[in-house]
């Protein structure tokens, strides 16, 4: 008698099984939708990561993209040279050849007329090449931590002949290295390992951060980008604040935020290529006076990594750290593969399916 189910009980059991099945299916669907936030201070490489996703998980840059980035390359190149020229006066550095002053005036005039996005005339290109070869300009470039200069300056200025050619078309690497300040929120969609990613890139400068809060619901994981190179630089928007100190403060507020109690945090210590060169001549103690280790890449990165990871106040939260070079497609492909595996495991655990 106890084993016989009434029609109503059988129907209730069927409904219960169906609900359980639906919940499991919903869990699987939820596990397949991934909302990723790219956060970090200004110029930490967030937008470059977005461009890499386009190369790795979409079809790369279209002919239209290349056309749109061409004036940006022209502008980034001449603006970088103009920034060095302006710093020559500020730092009191003399040109190796006095005749370079006329070339410098030509460059600054083009920038002030807002013609920096135009292809270079043969005269302008020659002036830029002569300037970049000048010993005074090179001395000033080597002191770039004392003023604001794009990371890509050397890359572009070393390629002046190619960029100034009449038939110039930006390469993938040229596009990856372009710098345009992100304003507002940029959303990118792609599919990888059967997951549907929605990646949100939000401007990192102080004025942009108030826009972050709109993105904070239902976040699967945060990728927090840090420019390793910021340890000896000050902010664009506040020249009294060290960039690394600002980034650490920001990481602390994100990592320990109540919104992100159950959110995976992935830390990208970025710009390792530039940092590797910079650390040889600019000591880490500029940012971390307590540091007593050698100014070698491995030890300096390990100390910086510890500074970030020790900000995590939750015993249950793990920080997944990667040392990255956002302009290196192979490196980002490898790292993003590892990041995705973390997300899959984390998601399935959350749904009770792992």
Swiss-Prot record:
Task: Indicate whether Lipoprotein appears among the record's keywords.
Answer: yes
Amino acids binding Mg(2+): 47, 182
Q: Which residues bind GTP?
A: 43, 46-48, 152, 176-179, 270, 273, 325
Q: What is its EC number?
A: 3.6.5.-
The reaction(s) catalysed by this protein are: GTP + H2O = GDP + phosphate + H(+)
> Has UniProt tagged this entry with the keyword Hydrolase?
yes
Which residues bear N-myristoyl glycine-type lipidation? 2
Lipid attachment in record (S-palmitoyl cysteine) = 3
MF terms (GO), sorted A to Z: corticotropin-releasing hormone receptor 1 binding; G protein-coupled serotonin receptor binding; G-protein beta/gamma-subunit complex binding; GTP binding; GTPase activity; metal ion binding; mu-type opioid receptor binding
Residue ranges of the region described as G4 motif: 266-273
* Residue ranges, annotated region (G3 motif): 197-206
Q: Where is this region: G2 motif?
A: 174-182
Region (G5 motif) residue spans: 324-329
Regarding protein family, the annotation reads:
Belongs to the G-alpha family. G(i/o/t/z) subfamily.
**Subunit arrangement?**
G proteins are composed of 3 units; alpha, beta and gamma.
Function summary: Guanine nucleotide-binding proteins (G proteins) function as transducers downstream of G protein-coupled receptors (GPCRs) in numerous signaling cascades. The alpha chain contains the guanine nucleotide binding site and alternates between an active, GTP-bound state and an inactive, GDP-bound state. Signaling by an activated GPCR promotes GDP release and GTP binding. The alpha subunit has a low GTPase activity that converts bound GTP to GDP, thereby terminating the signal. Both GDP release and GTP hydrolysis are modulated by numerous regulatory proteins.
Q: What is this protein called?
A: Guanine nucleotide-binding protein G(o) subunit alpha
| Native source species | Xenopus laevis (African clawed frog)
């Amino acid at each position: 008698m106890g084993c016989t189910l009434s029609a109503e009980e059988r129907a209730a059991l069927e409904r219960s099984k169906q609900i359980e099945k639906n919940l499991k299916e919903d869990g699987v669907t939820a596990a397949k939708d991934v909302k990723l936030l790219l956060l970090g201070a200004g110029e930490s490489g967030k937008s470059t990561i977005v461009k890499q996703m386009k190369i790795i998980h979409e079809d790369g840059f279209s002919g239209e993209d290349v056309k749109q980035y061409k004036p940006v390359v022209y502008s980034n190149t001449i603006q970088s040279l103009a920034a060095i020229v302006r710093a020559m006066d500020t730092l009191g550095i003399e040109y190796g050849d006095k005749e370079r002053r006329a070339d410098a005036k030509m460059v600054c005039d083009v920038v002030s007329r807002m013609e920096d996005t135009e292809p270079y005339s043969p005269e302008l290109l020659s002036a830029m090449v002569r300037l970049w070869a000048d010993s005074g300009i090179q001395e000033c470039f080597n002191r770039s931590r004392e003023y604001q200069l794009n990371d890509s300056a050397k890359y572009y200025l070393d390629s002046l002949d190619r960029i100034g050619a009449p038939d110039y078309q930006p390469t993938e690497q040229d596009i990856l290295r372009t710098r345009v300040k992100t304003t507002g929120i940029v959303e990118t969609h792609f599919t990888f390992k059967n997951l549907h990613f929605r990646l949100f890139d939000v401007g990192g400068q102080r004025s942009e951060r108030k826009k972050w809060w709109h993105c904070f619901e239902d976040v699967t994981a945060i990728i927090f980008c840090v420019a390793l190179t910021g340890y000896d630089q000050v902010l664009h928007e506040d020249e009294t604040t060290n960039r690394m100190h600002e980034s650490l403060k920001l990481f602390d507020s994100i990592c320990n935020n109540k919104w992100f109690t159950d959110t995976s945090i992935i830390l990208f210590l970025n710009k390792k290529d530039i940092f590797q060169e910079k650390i040889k001549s600019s000591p880490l103690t500029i940012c971390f006076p307590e540091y007593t280790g050698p100014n070698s890449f491995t030890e300096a990165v390990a100390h910086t990594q510890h500074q970030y990871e020790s900000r995590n106040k939750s015993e249950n939260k793990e920080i997944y750290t990667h040392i990255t070079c956002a302009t290196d497609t192979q490196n980002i492909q490898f790292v993003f593969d590892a990041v995705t595996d973390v997300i899959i495991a984390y998601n399935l655990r959350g749904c009770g399916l792992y």
